[in-house]
């Protein structure tokens, strides 16, 4: 049986999987990149994937009115949690996951480096 792909969810064009993509390529591990910021929908069924990696972006987790795809991304991540699909959140992706899990996320007093 073929291995299910790892899914990367891109929230902005310039935030891609970079070295993670190279890691997977070198090991012949299948992966898929979804440009959800460009209105590419999130998948319906998270069980199609071996793991999900929501990536970064400059937006805030609560800016769903300005970035409607965030709402769909949160719903999809909640389904991943329900189905025990491994999730690795990067930057904004970790904040989205934290929100889905019920944690409080807020703006830090200091900028990131």
Where is each model-derived feature located?
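Ubiquitous "structural anchor" signal
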Residues: 64-65, 97, 101
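N-terminal beta1-alpha1 cap of cysteine-dependent amidohydrolase-like domains
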Residues: 1-83
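Short alpha-helical
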Residues: 14-15, 95, 113
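Residue-level "edge-of-site" marker
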Residues: 37, 93, 111
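A conserved active-site-flanking secondary-structure segment within enzyme catalytic domains
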Residues: 99-113
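Gly/Ala-rich beta-loop-alpha elbow adjacent to hydrolase catalytic centers
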Residues: 89, 93, 98
